[in-house]
């Protein structure tokens, strides 16, 4: 009996076959000199950082988003693309116009500099879920405040990671 497996025919370890699509990126960096980042995005990121009241226990809670998405080698563009799209969700919050302006600048500026092509996947609209029982007014207020604090913690961490990722990319570009 003649037993030949796929990996021996083509000489490719199976791990590479699994990791190959993840490492490839459909983004092209524009503004490779870093000027647009330094002069526009960095300023808005710093302004947003200063606007957010930082709570010391924010850093102890790492959200699942960062466990699933990180700025690892060859994944920088993918991380920044997801992070910029995540920033857009914060525009729906009840925040000041100045805050929205900086948030929009960072989100749109990042997406513009990355120049990513969309994959055209259709998204399923979020379900409304089951009706929740109403709670008393005090509980609702405290839950809203807690949620807002968690959102601001997440935003603060996200901005720091975006900044770190951009710096990593620009260091890599200047070295080559």
Swiss-Prot record:
It holds the Pfam family IL7. One of its GO terms (cellular component) is extracellular space. Disulfide bonds join 27-165, 58-153, 71-116. Keywords: Cytokine, Disulfide bond, Glycoprotein, Growth factor, Secreted, Signal. This is Interleukin-7. Glycans are attached at residues 94, 115, 140. The keyword Secreted applies. Residues 1-25 form the signal peptide. It comes from Ovis aries (Sheep). GO terms for molecular function: cytokine activity; growth factor activity; interleukin-7 receptor binding. Belongs to the IL-7/IL-9 family. InterPro entries: IL-7, IL-7/IL-9_CS, IL7_sf. It is found in: Secreted. Residues 119-142 are annotated as: Disordered. GO terms for biological process: B cell proliferation; bone resorption; extrinsic apoptotic signaling pathway; homeostasis of number of cells within a tissue; immune response; interleukin-7-mediated signaling pathway; negative regulation of apoptotic process; negative regulation of extrinsic apoptotic signaling pathway in absence of ligand. Hematopoietic cytokine that plays an essential role in the development, expansion, and survival of naive and memory T-cells and B-cells thereby regulating the number of mature lymphocytes and maintaining lymphoid homeostasis. Mechanistically, exerts its biological effects through a receptor composed of IL7RA subunit and the cytokine receptor common subunit gamma/CSF2RG. PROSITE patterns: INTERLEUKIN_7_9. Its main location: secreted. Interacts with IL7R and CSF2RG.
């Amino acid at each position: 009996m003649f037993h030949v497996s796929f990996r021996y025919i083509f000489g490719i370890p199976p791990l590479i076959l699994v990791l190959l699509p993840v490492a490839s990126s459909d983004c092209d960096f524009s503004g490779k000199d870093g000027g647009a980042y330094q002069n526009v995005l960095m300023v808005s990121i710093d302004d947003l950082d200063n606007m957010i009241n930082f709570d010391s226990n924010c850093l102890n809670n790492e959200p699942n988003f960062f466990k699933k998405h990180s700025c690892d080698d060859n994944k920088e563009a993918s991380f920044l693309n997801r992070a910029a799209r995540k920033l857009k969700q914060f525009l729906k919050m009840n925040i000041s116009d100045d805050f929205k302006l900086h948030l929009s600048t960072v989100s749109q500026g990042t997406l513009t500099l990355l120049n990513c092509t969309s994959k055209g996947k259709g998204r399923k609209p979020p379900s409304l879920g089951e009706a929740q029982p109403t709670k008393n007014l005090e509980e609702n207020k405290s839950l809203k405040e807690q949620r807002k604090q968690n959102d601001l913690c997440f935003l603060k961490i996200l901005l720091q990671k975006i900044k770190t990722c951009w710096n990593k990319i620009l260091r890599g570009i200047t070295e080559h």
